[in-house]
């Protein structure tokens, strides 16, 4: 492309063959036209790379970057390195977007623009901000509501529009050492340097909900929780000067509570053995900061099981197993 595009759409691709064509087609049929698409083939073995190449031959807005497999965080970082647009948008390779997606993201000139998502697949549902809201860094706490089921700033790297210069000039990257929720860390790093934010009441992003595999469940561990917590703690220390201690306390507590919820939701899945479950919970209890995290759970009825799991891990595990067995028996009867 002879001139710099307004938007760079970065799509990490890894064995998404069954969904890839729908994904790319949804991007090419946008009402907003000034963009490039970077398809980052992360060592696919199912022909996804060839699908990407075939689209690039037909549309000059598409660039394909082939690389060895190193995970989605690495693929997104590779896309950032090659992005030419003034702004960056991330779209996962198995998702789809409406034809107004990019147009809506360009309604504001804020450093960060956030919209909602429409979930489909294993789970369904639509979540989006209720109305347009423009705000600065000083109002961050008001949009980081501990009692809210959805935090549009915290979750996802998709359904957002970032400013490329902020990312590149400050060396903001996806942490390639993390197994899950690397988007959380990327977003927090970005907030250290962004001044203006806009939430928009759209749900143009189609987020495909995939079932977690047995292997992924076994990879979830206390060590992963520790890595996340320690990395986020560094972000929180830097945020202190920008938003003050009161706002920081709200952001910190809410973010860590959501992280803890995710950790235990993985541990309570089918397929986790009692040995793995107890080992992870006991290791978590040994952490110097586990008391702080557990204090966040006080009074939260929906996660009472987590509190009991920390106090009585083996009993809690077998209680869960027994309850699931009863439910299965009744449903089959």
Language-model segments: which ranges?
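Cell-envelope/extracellular polymer assembly enzymes that use nucleotide-activated donors
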Residues: 5-8, 26, 36, 185
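Short, well-formed alpha-helical segments that are part of the catalytic scaffolds
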Residues: 15-29
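A conserved acidic beta->alpha catalytic loop
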Residues: 26, 41-50, 92
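Short beta-strand/loop segment that forms part of the nucleotide-sugar
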Residues: 34-43, 63-68, 93
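Glycine-rich, basic loop-to-helix element that forms the pyrophosphate-binding segment
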Residues: 67-83
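Donor-binding/catalytic cores of nucleotide-activated saccharide
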Residues: 72, 93-200, 205-226, 233
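Short aromatic/hydrophobic "clamp" motif used to bind/position activated sugar donors
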Residues: 88
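Membrane-interface aromatic/basic loop that binds lipid-linked glycans or pyrophosphate carriers
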Residues: 269-333
């Amino acid at each position: 492309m002879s001139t710099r595009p307004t938007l760079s759409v970065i799509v990490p691709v890894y064995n998404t063959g069954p969904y890839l064509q729908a994904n790319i087609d949804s991007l090419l049929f946008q009402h907003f036209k000034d963009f490039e698409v970077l398809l980052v083939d992360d060592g696919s073995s199912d022909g996804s790379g060839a699908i990407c190449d075939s689209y690039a031959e037909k549309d000059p807005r598409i660039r394909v970057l082939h690389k060895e497999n190193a995970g989605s965080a690495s693929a997104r970082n590779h896309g950032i390195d090659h992005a030419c647009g003034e702004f960056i948008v991330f779209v996962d390779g198995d998702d789809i977007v409406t034809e107004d997606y990019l147009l809506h993201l360009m309604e504001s000139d804020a450093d960060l623009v956030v919209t909602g998502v429409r979930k489909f697949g294993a789970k369904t549902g639509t979540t989006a901000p209720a109305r347009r809201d423009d705000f600065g860094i000083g109002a961050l706490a008001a949009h980081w509501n501990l009692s809210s089921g959805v935090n549009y700033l915290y979750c996802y790297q998709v359904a957002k529009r970032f400013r490329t210069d902020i990312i590149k000039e400050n060396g903001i990257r996806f942490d390639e050492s993390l197994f899950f929720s690397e988007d959380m860390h990327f977003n927090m790093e970005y907030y250290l340097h962004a001044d203006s934010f806009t939430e928009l009441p759209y749900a143009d992003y189609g987020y495909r909900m995939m079932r977690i595999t047995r292997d992924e469940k076994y990879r979830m561990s206390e060590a992963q929780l520790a890595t996340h917590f320690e990395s986020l703690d560094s972000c929180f220390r830097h945020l202190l000067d920008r938003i003050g201690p009161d706002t920081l306390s709200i952001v910190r507590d809410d973010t860590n509570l959501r992280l803890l919820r995710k950790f235990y939701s993985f541990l309570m899945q089918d397929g986790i053995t009692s040995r793995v479950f107890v080992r992870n919970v006991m290791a978590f209890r040994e952490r110097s900061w586990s008391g702080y995290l557990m204090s966040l759970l006080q009074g939260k009825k929906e996660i009472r099981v987590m509190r009991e799991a920390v106090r009585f891990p083996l009993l809690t595990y077998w209680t869960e197993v027994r309850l699931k067995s009863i439910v299965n028996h009744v449903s089959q009867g």
